[in-house]
Amino acid sequence: MSMTKADQYLVSDIKNILENGYKDIDPRPKYEDGTPAHTISVNHVTRKYDLSRGEFPICTLRKQAWKTGIREIFTIYQNPTNVLSEMEAMGVTWWTPWDIGDGTIGQRYGATVKRYDLVNKLIENIEKDPYGRRKIMSLWQETDLRETPGLAPCAFLTIWNVRGKYLDMCMIQRSGDMLTASGAGGINEIQYAALLIMIARATGYEAGVFTHFVANEQIYDRHIENAHELLRRAEVAAASSAKALSPASSVEASGASSADTASASDAADASDSDALPMLILHKHSKCAISDIRVEDFEMTNYTPMEPQLRFELGI
């Protein structure tokens, strides 16, 4: 099994935090049992993927709920809402702890996108002024943050640039829980890469480079054991890939014909096993973003390692 570019980033980033991260003091989040949720973290993490070259950001070292991640991005940018019941109807259930008491997450995320009509303005800007440098969607609106309580947006800014036939996008995230959401090949990268694919399709471009910048990325203290498990899995994946590429120690063949057949079969198997995951949008070019459905997406060649890992959240 070949590791994806995201897997390689994840291994490097985990090692960096474990070796160089600093522990916070008096953290705001708490675990369900009331214990302060401490983290170790580093600042200014950057990752880059070229979707046009098959570098889709998804981790194979553990299973990612990629379809649910795309459903969440729909509730923010396609059918924007902050109402928990509407989010849950889309299968997005992890926002319940951030209910501000009125069945919403406050004037945040989808509510901000809807209030300022961010998606339609972005698409119009791309179509009318493709090489302009002002194509930005910002969820960080001070008026909204003051209006209601609620979790301040973590992934809050996207910047869009046209490059020939490609549409590139940079996503800025102020804070990221590496192993549950923001890390390489995690939910945040999957869903924003999907958003890039959607906006590119809606404007007639091909999805190009996706860059992810996290100002502060953390590993929670109760996630450290799982961090080491992911490093162990990476070693297993690397060893498996190396073994698949090495020549057989002994080959028994009765003649050239059967040997040639075996070699061809092995090559085909190796080619299949090395195929990397890719998110495919089954929609014709220049379709309206409102016409895209979650079911139009397909993840190909995705075989993550098992068993699934569980992570306790700091709220």
Predicted regions and their residues:
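Terminal, non-catalytic protein-protein interaction segments that mediate quaternary/complex assembly
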Residues: 1-246, 260, 266-315
